[in-house]
Regions:
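Conserved ABC ATPase "signature" region
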Residues: 13, 27-36, 93-94, 131, ...
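Helix-to-loop junction immediately C-terminal to a conserved catalytic motif
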Residues: 78
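Conserved ABC ATPase signature
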Residues: 164-168, 172
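A short, proline-enriched helix->beta-strand linker immediately N-terminal to the Walker B motif
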Residues: 183-187
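Conserved ABC ATPase "signature" C-loop
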Residues: 243-245
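ABC ATPase "signature
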Residues: 249-250, 258, 356
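The conserved cystathionine-beta-synthase
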Residues: 284-306, 312, 319-350, 355-375, ...
């Protein structure tokens, strides 16, 4: 794998289930829709020409309703489900061309999987479950035990090594499943609705723990979910699927601000925009800063390096003030903005002045009247990769445009 190649590259991946596969694929190539193909051939189109790229160390959430194809896509990545058409490359190797023995070895060393229903062995202890993947690989007992114990420590189960599964709660069992995947030190983690069976509070805890682990370990993770709130909490890129195709791919902020289709609009209509939209998207860049000594009172003042120093006061004085970080969410910014009628200066990660966040912009955002964010902006893309999947459905011409409705103040 070259330094610039994504960890996962899926190109034109289709999967159909039924006895008339060739006919169904021909109809698919001719532009027939899923329902027509099913009615004519009795063959179900599970995936329709999916293109997907996931960079090394990126967390991608694949979302959609039941039957949208998200779990089938996940299993096509490691060929647990055989693609009917298309190619999949992982770590520079094309799995769709591997023989059975090579594929088994590739799966063992490249992929870890975490399932919704744990898939643990009830007759084994926690430690024996976690070391199972290494045992299958033929790793020596002492080495695999060390790796399993380290993985259990990472997920907060140190001290539970010799317990039976019957002694664990649901959340602890899912931690054990995650530890099993981590112990194998796989480059790619495939997580299929891994937290869906957990109670809400435990689920949120597991989401936070996964985010913390990802920051530390920088694994490449493909996480399947049907819950947009979960996708937002995980903070990665989102690929949203419908009828076997990816209909929108981008950050949570980009999808909430500019849904590509009515289907996507329905997905995001109940999401709190204050929890998703970031200050850098809403900043008024037309408010210029000045140098100390020649600024009107209240004007942001910057130094020679463009860093915010404060606000100008009477007599040429500068009153220190902290700028809002462009990466902060609107929810984090609202308490500060409420105390500043003239708006709050916004700075980048290095403290350089970018502009001012105004109350009108915040109100427009809460009313979902914001311009679509630039997906490449550093404050809108927590994952290193930019969106790379083309929309399978064109933007709806009937969708409301995200334009400001209040005059700038």
């Amino acid at each position: 794998m070259s330094a610039t190649e994504p960890m996962i590259v899926a190109e034109g991946v289709s999967r159909v289930f039924g006895t008339r596969e060739r006919e169904a694929l021909a109809m698919l190539a001719a532009g027939e829709d899923r329902a027509a193909i099913l009615a004519r051939t009795g063959t179900l189109v599970a995936l329709n020409a999916v293109d997907l790229r996931v960079d090394e160390g990126e967390l991608l959430v694949v979302m959609g309703l039941s039957g949208s194809g998200k779990s089938t896509l996940l299993r096509c990545l490691n060929r647990l489900v055989e693609p009917s058409r298309g190619t999949v490359r992982v770590a520079g190797r094309e799995g769709t061309r591997m023989g059975a023995r090579e594929l088994r070895e590739f799966r063992r060393r490249t992929f870890g999987m975490v399932f919704q229903h744990f898939a643990l062995f009830p007759h084994r202890t926690v430690l024996e479950n976690v070391e199972f993947g290494l045992e299958v690989q033929g790793i020596a007992r002492a080495a695999r035990r060390r790796a399993a114990e380290e993985a259990l420590g990472l997920v907060g189960l140190a001290g539970w090594e010799d317990k039976r599964l019957s002694q664990l709660s649901g959340g602890m069992k899912q931690r054990a499943g995650l530890a099993r995947a981590l112990a194998a030190d796989a480059a790619v983690l495939l997580m299929d609705e891994a937290f869906s069976a957990l109670d809400p509070l435990i689920r949120r805890d597991m989401q936070g723990e996964l985010v913390a682990l990802q920051r530390r370990l920088r694994k490449t993770i493909v996480f399947v979910s049907h819950d947009l709130e979960e996708a937002i909490a995980l903070g990665g890129r989102i690929a949203l699927m419908k009828d076997g195709a990816v209909v929108q791919d981008g950050t949570a902020e980009g999808i909430v601000a500019a849904p590509a289709t009515p289907y996507v609009e329905r997905f995001v209509e109940h999401v709190d925009p204050a929890a998703v939209l970031r200050v850098g998207t809403l900043v008024d860049r037309g408010t210029s800063a000045a140098r100390a000594g020649d600024a009107r009172p209240g004007t942001p003042v910057v130094g020679p390096d463009g860093r915010l120093l404060g606000r100008a006061a009477a007599g040429g004085a500068v009153v220190a003030c902290a700028g809002l970080d462009a990466g902060a969410t609107l929810r984090e910014a609202l308490p500060v903005l409420a105390a500043e009628p003239d708006g709050v200066p916004v700075v980048d990660g290095a403290g350089r002045y970018l502009g001012v966040l105004r109350r009108t912009a915040a109100l427009n955002a809460l009313a979902r009247r914001v311009p679509p964010p630039a997906e490449a902006s550093p404050w809108t893309s927590p994952s290193p990769a930019s969106p790379s999947t083309t929309s399978a459905t064109p933007p709806s011409t009937g969708s409301p445009r995200m334009e400001p409705v209040l005059p700038a103040s």
